[in-house]
Each structure stands twice: as C-alpha cells, then as structure tokens.
C-alpha cells in the first residue's frame, strides 16, 4: 500500500533530492496521517460515547491531537518548500525543523497528560464492560497505526526528513 500511494501520487519519485519531490512526499505523508487519524478519532469517539468508555474516548482525543501534529508537519513542509527570496536567500528549509520541534513538544505534552490520566485511573479504578464492537475498533486502530507508522517512517527515511521520522 505504501509503495502504491507513493507511485500514484508522487511524480519522479526516484529524484528525492528535488525539492518538489521532497515536498510532495512530505505533504502526502502528512495528508495520509491527517485522514487516518481523523477517521480513527471518529470511530473511537462514537464507540467511546456509545459505551461510556472514558479510555476509548480519551484515545479518540489522542488521535485528534495526532492529526493536529500532522497538520503542523504539513505546514512545516509547505513553509519549508518555499523558494529562496530576498529576505531568505538560503530558502525556508528551517521551518521544517521548527515543525519537527513543535511535533516533539506536542508528543511530550500528550504523553505527560496520558500518563497523569492513567495514574488517576489506577488510583480510582472504574468497572469495565466488554464489547466486541469496542474490541474490533481498537484492533483496527492498532493495525491502522502500525501501517501509518511504517508509511510515515518510510517516507521520512526516503526524503531524509527529521520531522516525519519524529512523527
């Protein structure tokens, strides 16, 4: 699927040194991340709300924050892909590094918040009800996230993007 998406949407894929190819690859990875994370958010939010599961709803919010990280990366690629101008004679490539820093900070903050929430649940546990629908949504989520991780890492490695590799 990864190779199919790259071949379908990226022209001249072999020339990753070309700024246009590099930018197109980064944009594709970010858009795929946004779409997958928004779909995961919707599925988990609906199931979490239907079954009253705080953990699934919290995971849905986590997917929404992942989508926002992808949006930050997309903006970084867009700004970083701008050509050199009078005020920036060496181009705008540093924006991609700033986007990578922003994504790293977001991941750190989300990790801390989820850690606090998990600790609160350990201290004050609530009963959990089993649901096949919840289980199916969570298994599908794991599979989608594994694929996304491989896809984004492959694109990041292909174009030597610290931002994508950090995502």
Q: Where in the sequence are the language-model features?
A:
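Alpha-helical transmembrane cores and adjacent cytosolic helix/loop segments
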Residues: 1-167
